[in-house]
Amino acid sequence: MANQNKAYLALTVTSIVWGTTWVASKMGVMHMPAFEMASIRQFLGGSLYVGFFLIKGEKLPTKKQFLWLLGMSLLMFVSSNGIATYGLKFITSGLAALIAALYPLSVVLIERYYYKAIEIKPKTIIGLCLGLLGIGFIFYKDSLTVHGSNYILGVILSFIAMITWSIGSIIISRTKININA
């Protein structure tokens, strides 16, 4: 299979898996505590990830690398995914997906604010707008439905989750750690 076809296949699989996690998480929080469900999901995913690299013959991280990974896991998986999953108790999966789709925009804006040298190019703005419009088109019917008195709490939690994921992504991209991840 050509590299370009592999890339398209990977993008398609990632889009389907990522897109369905919002609906699956929404269903899950109806039947179990949100942080328990998020923990199970992250544990299974992490175990498969580590297993894949061990099968390939990769070494386990050093103590320093492990501590860094632990810190990033707390920021991104506990804070972001845990809070996002908890927020799904109060809002629709479509609205949660729309808020999460603001992630690329928040990364660009945070990087621009803190790292002034970063230029926001027209291509970047067009890509961000098209991505957000695409998610909006898919979830527009579901996204603005208000359910229950804790709706605002769900929106706030989803925004906090999106911002913590953005900050974690920026930290990872700017930290030089020699690890195969």
Model-based region annotation:
Residues E36-S47, M76, A84-K123, A161:
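Specific alpha-helical transmembrane segments that line the substrate/conduction pathway
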Residues I16-V17, T21-W22, G51-A100, G136-F137:
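Specific transmembrane alpha-helical segments of multi-pass solute transporters/efflux pumps
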Residues Y49, L70-M72, P104, I110, ...:
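Hydrophobic transmembrane alpha-helices of multi-pass small-molecule transport proteins
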